């Protein structure tokens, strides 16, 4: 044929229309209550784990984030997988040789919960450089869901972001960029052990405040001023405003440290590695779009 047909259609994920009934106060109250039932222990490194160190968790968490990004998983998959990881480590001692297997299993289950086409066991084994087998992953999956008592629909910070945005008088184009930046902060927080003690609602609220601050939106909208937005969100999630400010400042400090180490690594990889060894929590890797945030 002289003229070939050119198909320009792009496959898009089919999503349900937004339902305002799912964003009302009754649902938010239920979510705030539900997040308490899926909280990990904040002291599992001292009380439960004998071989696993925070730095090891950081390495596995960064690897999990990279896998989720490369596979273009839904934003909720990685935080949900980290919730499973933290809760399992709160209950069961794990040998360091099996930590990557646990991380892969957590992604495997989380993708089943959030993806229309979940990650396969074979694909996850490839990402471990075939250090684990599919049958090992399936066995660990059974152990994981039993230890978690099949309570797999855990609340994550992403569940709260939409509630906050729906209550904020902000233009839709600004909501989209706030959402994207807040999601990036959530992913960054999930890799750091210091945020295990913060409930998902507080991480979400702190991420939204940090996103608004970084985008300098408070100058054009008085509602988005730092103190007013912090007071508003603290009332929404029923927490002390000072606690929310502390969480938001911790997020910004984590971002700055992550950016600084990423820049050092690009200029002097050896010096960056030495600095990582000095810190218990390795913050060298940054999630997508973090470098676009200005604070």
Curated annotation (Swiss-Prot):
Q: Which Pfam families match?
A: Cyclin_C, Cyclin_N
Report the GO terms under cellular component: cyclin-dependent protein kinase holoenzyme complex; cytoplasm; microtubule organizing center; nuclear membrane; nucleus; transcription repressor complex
Q: For the cross-link Glycyl lysine isopeptide (Lys-Gly) (interchain with G-Cter in ubiquitin), what are the residue positions?
A: 270
* Keyword Disulfide bond on entry: no
Q: Which domain of life is it from?
A: Eukaryota
User: How does it get modified after it is made?
Assistant: Phosphorylation at Thr-286 by MAP kinases is required for ubiquitination and degradation by the DCX(AMBRA1) complex. It also plays an essential role for recognition by the FBXO31 component of SCF (SKP1-cullin-F-box) protein ligase complex following DNA damage. Ubiquitinated at Lys-270 by the DCX(AMBRA1) complex during the transition from G1 to S cell phase, leading to its degradation: ubiquitination is dependent on Thr-286 phosphorylation. The DCX(AMBRA1) complex represents the major regulator of CCND1 stability during the G1/S transition. Also ubiquitinated by the SCF(FBXO4) and Cul7-RING(FBXW8) ubiquitin-protein ligase complexes. Following DNA damage it is ubiquitinated by the SCF(FBXO31) protein ligase complex. SCF(FBXO31) ubiquitination is dependent on Thr-286 phosphorylation.
Where it sits in the cell: the answer is:
Nucleus; Cytoplasm; Nucleus membrane
Q: Which CDD domains match?
A: CYCLIN_CCND1_rpt1 (cd20573)
Question: Where is the segment annotated Disordered?
Answer: 264-295
Q: Which GO terms describe its molecular function?
A: cyclin-dependent protein serine/threonine kinase regulator activity; protein serine/threonine kinase activator activity; transcription corepressor activity
UniProt domain Cyclin N-terminal: residue ranges: 28-152
Q: Which residues carry this modification: Phosphothreonine?
A: 286
Keyword terms, alphabetized: Cell cycle, Cell division, Cyclin, Cytoplasm, Isopeptide bond, Membrane, Nucleus, Phosphoprotein, Repressor, Transcription, Transcription regulation, Ubl conjugation
* GO BP term, pick one: G1/S transition of mitotic cell cycle
* Ranges annotated as biased composition (Acidic residues): 273-282
Subunit comment for this entry? Answer: Interacts with either CDK4 or CDK6 protein kinase to form a serine/threonine kinase holoenzyme complex. The cyclin subunit imparts substrate specificity to the complex. Component of the ternary complex CCND1/CDK4/CDKN1B required for nuclear translocation and modulation of CDK4-mediated kinase activity. Interacts directly with CDKN1B. Can form similar complexes with either CDKN1A or CDKN2A. Interacts with UHRF2; the interaction ubiquitinates CCND1 and appears to occur independently of phosphorylation. Interacts with USP2.
Q: What does this protein do?
A: Regulatory component of the cyclin D1-CDK4 (DC) complex that phosphorylates and inhibits members of the retinoblastoma (RB) protein family including RB1 and regulates the cell-cycle during G(1)/S transition. Phosphorylation of RB1 allows dissociation of the transcription factor E2F from the RB/E2F complex and the subsequent transcription of E2F target genes which are responsible for the progression through the G(1) phase. Hypophosphorylates RB1 in early G(1) phase. Cyclin D-CDK4 complexes are major integrators of various mitogenenic and antimitogenic signals.
Q: Which family does it belong to?
A: Belongs to the cyclin family. Cyclin D subfamily.
Q: What is this protein called?
A: G1/S-specific cyclin-D1
Report the source organism.
Canis lupus familiaris (Dog)
